[in-house]
Amino acid sequence: MQVGNILINAISDGTFIARPTYFGDHAAAGHYDLFDRHGQAWLPIGCFLVRSGTRCVLVDAGMGPSRMWDGDDEPCRLVGGQLPVALRALGVHRDDVTDVVCTHLHPDHVGWLFDLDSRPNFPHATIWFGQGDWRYFIDRDDPLIQEHIHHGFRGHAGDAHLRPIDRDTSVAPGITAIQAPGHTPGHLCVVVASDGQRALLLGDAITCPVQLDEPAWHSMGDVDPGLADRTRERLWRELEGDDVTGTGAHFPELKFGRVLGGSGKRWWT
């Protein structure tokens, strides 16, 4: 995806398998554009490499070399591991990454930040994330976060390369992290803008395009469902613009799209 002078490469670190129960009590498996005949949605674990001038910005760091696979009947299962290979295929070495923006600190977005010895996987990168997520996940020792990731954050607390933010912040030329709370307290989205064009990288603020038609569908991980609803609606409206396109970390095939509206109906295209 080219946005003016900025190049965005979509990368899948692995697979996120969701059942209807992941989206709450209102979800049904009848959405055959999302669920297969076994009632499972096969979604990517998305990351995005954004190159702007001399800056090489990774948005989200995947699941890492780990998995969440407690049983076939669980609402969701995740397995990662592909990000390093994908970066190499794009000609990018881990030393080349100048910034990592974590839309939030769920395990499928931070998994490659630190190696299993809690050392930074991207040694020259500034890591940006929401201050509210630090308080919620790291200060509280949330068991959802992988142990080596916890230790990595805590061991480098106060380091200049860890940048918690609590307001909209410019990360690099044409790349801005904006506040989008609800899914998690400090959830961020990323706006890429160049030459009058914009792209929104939504993280998990919107899990999949079906939620445009099914506003009652939540994500199992929403910390504040009411606030997550309001944030989703704000982002849907933002995506109605002629100059903007967007995608989320779990959108099928990580395809970019926009919202078309008319006659009281909205479509994702």
Regions found by a protein language model. Give the residues of each.
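Residue-level marker for buried hydrophobic side chains located in beta-strands
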Residues: V57-V59, V101, I127, A199-L201, ...
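Cap/insert and terminal regions of metallo-dependent hydrolase folds
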Residues: C76-G81, V85, D195-T269
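Metal-dependent catalytic neighborhoods of phosphoester/phosphodiester hydrolases
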Residues: V110-P120, R258-V259
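Short Gly/Pro-enriched turn/cap motifs at secondary-structure boundaries
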Residues: R37-A41, I178-H183
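Conserved beta-strand hairpin/beta-sheet module of binuclear metal-dependent hydrolase folds
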Residues: M1-A89, C189-C208
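Metallo-beta-lactamase
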Residues: Q2, L78-V92, D96-D108, P123-Q179, ...
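Active-site metal-binding loops of divalent metal-dependent hydrolases
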Residues: D13-G14, A61-G64, L105, G132-D133, ...
